[in-house]
Amino acid sequence: MEDLFGRIMLDIEGTSLTNDDRSILSNSQVGGIIFFSRNFESHNQIKGLISEIKSIKENIIFAVDQEGGRVQRFKNDFTLMPSLQDLSKYSDANKIDICKEVAWLNSSELLAVGIDVNFAPVLDLDESSSSIIGNRAFSSSSEEVVKFASSYIDGMHEAGMRSTAKHFPGHGGVIEDSHISLPEDIRSLDDLFNSDLKPYLELVNKIDAVMCAHVLFSNIDKFIPSYSRLWIDEILKNQIGFDGIVFSDDLTMIGAGNDDFFEKAYNSVLAGCDMTLICNNRQEAINAINHFEEMGVEQSNKILRMKKTKHIDWNDLAISERALSVKKHLQNIRS
């Protein structure tokens, strides 16, 4: 039987499943779950929750934002990770490839509890203007971002996790936070190819997935990337040559627009997104699921590519010499 996955990724409210959760998870249009801090208590709890969900549905991927620094959903039991920018500075100062090692440890911990996807690394440039990116980015230099992100992705792959580059084509050049507004970037496509898009061009053969930015590039297209065939089909796939998975960012963010959620979700799929995220609004997620069923949205076998390729047991990881070595470096970064 072909491994088909639904095209909607959604969230759950707490640390255990409700009857409503069990009902919606059984729907064929649901192909992914993203976890937040509210869903997490310990590594044993999240592992048990994932096992329970898998007993309801096998063809589903589990995702989290575990970049490090400001964005780390799982903390208790997990290694506290520094921001990507702190990693790059430490790596340069000490002439060591710490990005690869930290990515390996971060990915290994997530894989050990059943997480398939960490939405990382951030490929945005820190242009000292964005209120939401900042030190989530490796650097302000596209060359530096390529160098450090390449190592980071190598570490993810060694652990058995696929990479997800974000936020395509770039969120670092705008001031506004797309969670609470729609940022507008007036640069030309040539400008972007000479800056923000360079990491995607250089790393296209390493990147497994891309998450789209909720930013309006008004001199390039009237649609944000998640709804844009120009951005996804023409620029990302044809011009850059990307052949991986495309995720929308969360459609409940203000930057995703004011249309009905089922229209936003459907438009993202029409534009070329393989999976669309609807978080923190269960009723609208249900509406989108119903609309997908009415419109005959087909499940996808591409999502299978994002499943983990291997993993190390949690207890074995705890005593791994490699893990202990990485943790020593992390103590130095924090000190």
Where are these regions (language model features)?
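Short, acidic/polar
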Residues: I12-N27, I98-E109, N194-Y200, D260-N267
